[in-house]
């Protein structure tokens, strides 16, 4: 399997993990959201895509509310 093929597989897996994370959050399944968000972060780290974290705004809102 070539690096290009691996990148394509990881890109699809990243998209799926993001979709599942947002879907989980929209249904108040917070633990499941955390699971899929963590999967996304892990896949993003091992891929060469370096995508920006789609959950950053959620984290920033949580930090504001915490204070």
Model-derived regions, located:
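Short amphipathic alpha-helical heptad-repeat segments
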Residues: 6-18
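Short, charge-rich, low-complexity alpha-helical interaction segments
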Residues: 1-8, 60-67
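Short, charge-rich amphipathic alpha-helical segments embedded
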Residues: 34-59
